[in-house]
């Protein structure tokens, strides 16, 4: 991009933008350099908003889903130990100049950074604090997270065995004490603080369902193996905020729409801050469409607009 003439301005915080009388955009920023903060204003014929979602904005997320209390972290900051800058200041700025914002698509929640080790269905089970399964593990994440939010502690145990094909996070999760190994079901139950007879019955019942190809408890039909080969791998899984599905309203040309539904001249949007692209849920990896396809359209149309007289 530098070879193409692009200029990168680091440590620049956008604090506002508005239309000029001539139709250009005034973009106000605070630039931090050498321990000082300088206010600057840039003028542009075209402006592309690509500031990301607002998963780290606790208040806005809680307004969308009141079940999301302060202890629910994001997938970018799963343990609450690092800074997550996915907040909604630019969304507020866009609304202030008349941009429409979608409402009602919500958030995508994932059980992601805890005990879950598999990237496919059929090789693990989810159990509650009593050691019992409570959900069809092959259902979409939205259904699973809703079931988890109904649990008293809003978390569950994920169990698999030595036969399953685990993801790249296995070693890291073992080292950090997120996932554990046990040679027997009894040892696993003890470390999980659940009744051993209950957990043993849960696994036996599940294995019978694997043999039949149908689980009468949850209706599950996707199985890849029995859970029986030690060592057993288990860990507590929680819910994390992964994606915001609401944001600035746009059209197929990546133009920002006003509250009246009219394209705002010279204003474009791409990425997670664009709302309503996926509806109320999305497939894993589909965000690349929003970033690359809509990003390409936003950039191309912004350039065309900037070249106008």
How does the language model describe each region?
Residues 10, 15-41, 47:
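Conserved beta-strand-loop-beta-strand element in the redox core of flavoprotein oxidoreductases
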Residues 16, 198-281:
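A glycine-rich dinucleotide-binding beta-alpha-beta segment and adjacent secondary-structure elements
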Residues 34-36, 42-111, 297:
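Glycine-rich loop(s) and the adjacent beta-strand/alpha-helix scaffold that form part
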Residues 83, 91-198:
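An anion/pyrophosphate-binding glycine-rich loop and adjacent beta-alpha core
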Residues 90-100, 192-195, 200-203, 290-309:
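Internal hydrophobic alpha-helix adjacent to the cofactor/substrate pocket in enzyme cavities
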């Amino acid at each position: 991009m530098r070879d193409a003439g692009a200029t990168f301005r680091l440590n620049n915080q956008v604090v506002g933008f508005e239309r000029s009388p001539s139709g250009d955009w005034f973009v106000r920023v605070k630039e931090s350099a050498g321990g000082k903060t300088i206010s600057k204003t840039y003028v542009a014929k075209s402006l592309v908003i690509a500031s990301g979602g607002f998963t780290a904005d606790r208040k806005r997320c809680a307004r969308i889903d009141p079940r999301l209390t302060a202890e629910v972290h994001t997938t970018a900051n799963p343990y609450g130990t690092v800074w997550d800058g996915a907040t909604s200041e630019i969304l507020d700025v866009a609304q202030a100049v008349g941009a429409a914002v979608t409402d009602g698509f919500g958030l995508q929640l994932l059980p992601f950074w805890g005990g879950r080790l598999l990237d496919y269905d059929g090789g693990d089970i989810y159990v509650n604090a009593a050691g019992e399964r409570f959900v069809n593990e092959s259902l979409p994440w939205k259904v699973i997270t809703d079931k988890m939010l109904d649990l008293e502690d809003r978390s569950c145990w994920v169990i698999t065995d030595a036969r399953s094909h685990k993801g790249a996070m296995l070693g890291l999760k073992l080292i950090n004490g997120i996932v554990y190994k046990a040679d027997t079901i009894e040892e696993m139950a003890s470390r999980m603080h659940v009744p051993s007879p209950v957990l043993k019955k849960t696994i036996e019942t599940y294995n019978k369902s694997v043999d039949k190809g149908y689980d009468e408890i949850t209706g599950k039909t996707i199985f890849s193996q029995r859970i029986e080969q030690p060592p057993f791998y288990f860990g507590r899984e929680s819910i994390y905020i992964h994606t915001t599905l609401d944001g600035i309203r746009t059209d197929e040309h990546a133009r920002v729409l006003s509250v009246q539904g009219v394209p705002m001249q010279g204003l474009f949007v791409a990425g997670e801050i664009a709302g309503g692209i996926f509806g109320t849920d999305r497939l894993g990896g589909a965000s690349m469409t929003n970033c690359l396809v809509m990003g390409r359209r936003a950039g191309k149309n912004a350039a065309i607009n900037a070249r106008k007289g």
